[in-house]
From Swiss-Prot:
InterPro entries: Kinase-like_dom_sf, Prot_kinase_dom, Tribbles/Ser_Thr_kinase_40. Residues 25-50 are annotated as: Disordered. Interacts with MAPK kinases and regulates activation of MAP kinases. Does not display kinase activity. Transmembrane segments: none annotated. PANTHER family: SER/THR PROTEIN KINASE-TRB (PTHR22961), TRIBBLES HOMOLOG 2 (PTHR22961:SF15). Keywords: Cytoplasm, Cytoskeleton, Protein kinase inhibitor. The gene is TRIB2. The keyword Cytoplasm applies. GO terms for cellular component: cytoplasm; cytoskeleton; nucleus. Residues 29-45 have a biased composition (Polar residues). This is Tribbles homolog 2. It comes from Canis lupus familiaris (Dog). Highly expressed in the thyroid, also present in ovary and cerebrum. The protein kinase domain is predicted to be catalytically inactive. Belongs to the protein kinase superfamily. CAMK Ser/Thr protein kinase family. Tribbles subfamily.
Length: 343
């Protein structure tokens, strides 16, 4: 597997070449460490437990401490031993980490996409370190009920910028949703795409896909309607529209507790936009949530929309200020994958 990246990253390997660093261009030649070497002198096993539990031992991985699990049994809170910097560590099987991270390796860096800071290779596991985050967009919108247009415009521009960069770099994200975007700062003014692990690497200019990958609330009509292929980029754009609507309105544009009823509403592509939104915001939503994929804006065209250049300080500041009274963003109801509905 050939992996290329325009900028290098630190990769440490344990064994004879302990602390050796390699660029992404050399990833294809990396193998597991020598079995005689041990990671941790005194702090327990370097490998996280198979299932998270309260008895998880603190583990020492190179210059990092792995603390409690954050998600499942493969994502952990980590701390740099010397600086005290907090990070996130994702643990992969050594045999498949290159495939899992391939989209990261083939895409150039972007300020709104989570970057790998270091990879440490063990005998059976690869430990991949990312900068920490300060919560996700789904939880933020749910807490706020909905966002004022000025705040939504600032955050959504960053979201669309990350997606446009992926599309320009030959990636289709497939499973876009608010939860995939996390905050870079405690003030919650800067966001980034949490991971690219679900992304599909395009071979050339053709972005046709045929899988049913995605989240029910965010899935596009053509994915539900067709048994053949569809435009992956256009499907991503539809998901962006669902995200924008949810940020501004406080509920999904299409919602129902029954999946079959939800999918029927999505297929029809009919939704209501509150009159409290500004004309430019309504225009952008309607330009994205088009039932016909070819009629939607591209991710790059979204960035050029005049809504983002609105001077909100002199425009009608009342837009988006009315409280939401029903259909708040659910905590988990429609956050499951599509797969069970098509098996």
């Amino acid at each position: 597997m050939n992996i290329h990246r325009s900028t290098p990253i630190t990769i440490a390997r344990y064994g004879r070449s302990r602390n050796k660093t390699q660029d992404f261009e050399e990833l294809s030649s990396i193998r597991s460490a020598e079995p005689s070497q041990s990671f941790s002198p005194n702090l327990g096993s370097p490998s996280p437990p198979e299932t998270p539990n309260l008895s998880h031992c603190v583990s020492c991985i190179g210059k990092y401490l792995l603390l409690e699990p954050l998600e499942g049994d493969h994502v952990f809170r980590a701390v740099h031993l010397h600086s005290g910097e907090e990070l996130v560590c994702k643990v992969f099987d050594i045999s498949c980490y290159q495939e899992s991270l391939a989209p990261c390796f083939c895409l150039s860096a972007h300020s709104n996409i989570n970057q790998i800071t270091e990879i440490i290779l063990g005998e059976t596991k690869a430990y991949v370190f990312f900068e920490r985050s300060y919560g996700d967009m789904h939880s933020f919108v749910r807490t706020c009920k909905k966002l004022r247009e000025e705040e939504a415009a600032r955050l959504f521009y960053q979201i669309a910028s990350a997606v446009a960069h992926c599309h320009d770099g030959g990636l289709v994200l497939r499973d876009l949703k608010l939860r995939k975007f996390i905050f870079k700062d405690e003030e919650r003014t800067r966001v980034k795409l949490e991971s690219l692990e679900d992304a599909y690497i395009l071979r050339g200019d053709d972005d046709s896909l045929s899988d049913k990958h995605g989240c029910p609330a965010y899935v596009s009509p053509e994915i539900l309607n067709t048994s053949g292929s569809y435009s992956g980029k256009a499907a991503d754009v539809w998901s962006l529209g669902v995200m924008l609507y949810t940020m501004l309105v406080g509920r999904y544009p299409f919602h129902d507790i029954e999946p079959s009823s939800l999918f029927s509403k999505i297929r029809r592509g009919q939704f209501n936009i509150p009159e409290t939104l500004s004309p430019k915001a309504k225009c952008l939503i309607r330009s994205i949530l088009r039932r016909e994929p070819s009629e939607r804006l591209t991710s790059q065209e979204i960035l050029d929309h005049p809504w983002f250049s609105t001077d909100f300080s002199v425009s009608n500041s009342g837009y988006g200020a009315k409280e939401v009274s029903d259909q708040l963003v659910p905590d988990v109801n429609m956050e499951e994958n599509l797969d069970p509905f098509f098996n």
